[in-house]
Amino acid sequence: MATVILGEFEWDDAKARANERKHGVSFVEALEAFLDPHGITAQEIEDADRFVLIGMSRRGRVLFVVSAESGERVRIVSARRATPSQRRVYEHGPKG
């Protein structure tokens, strides 16, 4: 299992290739969503070790990214285009 490290991010190379084939989103594009100042991050309820981010990439696509803390780095687990309801959360904010 080859781990790719890019700055404060890391991911499994085979997982990244499979994710891009399935969802059409590379993990390099996914890490751009972390740079979005309007991105929304939440801890997953089912898995306390994972976090979800809805943010925009430089390509202008709103992405849904699942990540986990891995020591001092953020490990990208999966990434896909946001669903319409997730996009609304991004555009209008989570309901209080």
Language-model features, listed with the residues they occupy:
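Ribonuclease/tRNase effector modules and their secretory precursors
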Residues: 1-96
